[in-house]
Amino acid sequence: MTGSCCGSTLSSLSYGGGCCQPCCCRDPCCCRPVTCQTTVCRPVTCVPRCTRPICEPCRRPVCCDPCSLQEGCCRPITCCPSSCTAVVCRPCCWATTCCQPVSVQSPCCRPPCGQPTPCSTTCRTSSC
């Protein structure tokens, strides 16, 4: 799925649910169209300055997504192959394994390449 297909006769459906991602080959931090993903990744330093489109499956963004429901977050530099500097995240933090994730809450950030950082969450009293 590395060939250029956006704007050609090959639609995203012909890639088995994949989507065309306007992105630069040298810059993995980019924004995918909202219609083909579950997460909107908008790193501050990653401005779309693409010269050609590449196609990827619709999956979690490269630089983002501690919990799949958030926006405006970038992985720590130790995880990300590019120099992302956005560090304020809105991840789904978990107090215990039986807590339901809270997708909108006070900003917090993940430790590098690790588990979500402890945050204030609202947990269901019922079992998961």
Swiss-Prot record:
Residues 5-112 are annotated as: 10 X 5 AA repeats of C-C-[CDPQRW]-[ADPRS]-[CIPSTV]. The keyword Repeat applies. GO terms for cellular component: cytosol; keratin filament. InterPro entries: KAP (IPR002494), KRTAP_type_2-like (IPR052154). It comes from the Eukaryota. Coiled coil: none annotated. Keywords: Keratin, Repeat. The keyword Chloroplast does not apply. Expressed specifically in the middle/upper portions of the hair cortex, in the region termed the keratogenous zone. Pfam families: Keratin_B2 (PF01500), Keratin_B2_2 (PF13885). Belongs to the KRTAP type 2 family. Interacts with hair keratins. In the hair cortex, hair keratin intermediate filaments are embedded in an interfilamentous matrix, consisting of hair keratin-associated proteins (KRTAP), which are essential for the formation of a rigid and resistant hair shaft through their extensive disulfide bond cross-linking with abundant cysteine residues of hair keratins. The matrix proteins include the high-sulfur and high-glycine-tyrosine keratins. This is Keratin-associated protein 2-4. It comes from Homo sapiens. The gene is KRTAP2-4.
